């Protein structure tokens, strides 16, 4: 299947008061039509910067240092703002974390969704715009769209506001939808509804989706593939089944053990010891080594390559090297198995 999106060896840096932060470091992945790829990791690992790099929504202090971004076979790495404006909305669109910040509280919902429709359909009549807005509201599950069309954001619940943001993002039928922590500001019940809606839209429209989250548990119900990020790098990537049921990287083990579902009620919830490294001056070897209870001597000296486990499953850990000792995984089995 042809890839909609291919990112190869992408590195992004951000100039800060203390120096240059290497926010994304040599990241490669691809996305197929209709696929849901979840990118998970701790706050600050580079998930959002990666997505904004692809859409060229980075602040002036950030720059792409190396690598390439191809969409539908076209290299867009060096595209200027005018060229990117033709892609945003139609080729890819984004749902941000906080719907209240994304919406204008002084403008009615129908008009805000309508603005997104008009930007990409300048020849639409008023009637066509209104019809499209109502269709989008129905698509994202907003009941009584004709009445709610005339309401303001403050008259909607948090979950309904997020649905409005989704309607805006879908206004031009994008090929790729970026969902940046879309459930963070919502309670657990509403989180499940929004995730189910994302999956429903993906199946109905064939929209490929990149779902960003810090919670492996959140993405379990919707992802086809999962990429685990740590300190600006993808350290493990595979199908959802492979990453959940056969994780190979010690960081992924830690994330899985941190899920409440793994607690037995008798022990305290597991936490990964230590803190992520400062990316102004990343460590020489494996960035996770100082927090990794299974670290080998080589982890402190040399960055591990991506080791192939299956045709779809890869992990960057020296534990997968044939010369490494057999380490018993806390999830069962060993890193080699």
Residue ranges, per PLM feature:
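The feature captures the beta-strand-to-loop junction immediately N-terminal to the Walker
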Residues: 40-41
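P-loop NTP-binding/switch modules centered on Walker-like glycine-rich loops
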Residues: 56, 178, 182, 186, ...
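Conserved ABC transporter NBD signature motif
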Residues: 64-75
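A short, proline-enriched helix->beta-strand linker immediately N-terminal to the Walker B motif
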Residues: 171-175
């Amino acid at each position: 299947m042809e890839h909609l999106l291919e990112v190869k060896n992408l590195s992004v840096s951000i100039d800060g008061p203390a120096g240059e932060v290497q926010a994304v470091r040599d990241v490669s992945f691809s996305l197929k039509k209709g696929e849901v790829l979840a990118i998970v990791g701790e706050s600050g690992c580079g998930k959002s910067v990666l997505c904004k790099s692809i859409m060229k929504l980075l602040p002036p202090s950030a720059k792409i240092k190396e690598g390439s971004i191809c969409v539908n076979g076209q290299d867009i790495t060096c595209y200027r703002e005018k060229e990117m404006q033709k892609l945003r909305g139609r080729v890819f669109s984004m749902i941000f974390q906080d719907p209240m910040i994304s919406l204008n509280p002084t403008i009615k919902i129908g008009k805000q969704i309508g603005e997104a429709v008009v930007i990409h359909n300048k020849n639409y009549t008023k009637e066509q715009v209104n019809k499209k807005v109502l269709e989008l509201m129905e698509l994202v599950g907003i009941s009584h769209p004709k009445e709610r069309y005339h309401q303001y954001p403050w008259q909607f619940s948090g979950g309904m506001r997020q649905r409005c943001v989704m309607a805006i993002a879908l206004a031009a039928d994008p090929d790729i939808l970026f969902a940046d922590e879309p459930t963070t500001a919502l309670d657990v019940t509403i989180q499940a509804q929004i995730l189910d809606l994302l999956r429903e839209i993906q199946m109905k429209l064939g929209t490929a989706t990149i779902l960003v989250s810090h919670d492996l548990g959140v993405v379990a119900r919707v992802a086809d593939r999962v990429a685990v990020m740590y300190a600006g790098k993808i350290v493990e990537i595979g199908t959802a089944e492979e990453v959940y049921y056969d994780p190979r990287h010690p960081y992924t083990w830690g994330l899985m053990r941190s899920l409440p579902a793994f607690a037995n009620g008798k022990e305290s919830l597991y936490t990964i010891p230590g803190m992520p490294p400062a990316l102004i001056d990343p460590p020489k070897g494996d960035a996770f080594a100082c927090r990794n209870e299974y670290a080998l001597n080589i982890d402190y000296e040399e960055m591990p390559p991506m080791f192939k486990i299956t045709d779809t499953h890869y992990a960057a850990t020296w534990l997968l090297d044939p010369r490494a000792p057999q380490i018993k995984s806390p999830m069962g089995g060993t890193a080699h198995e």
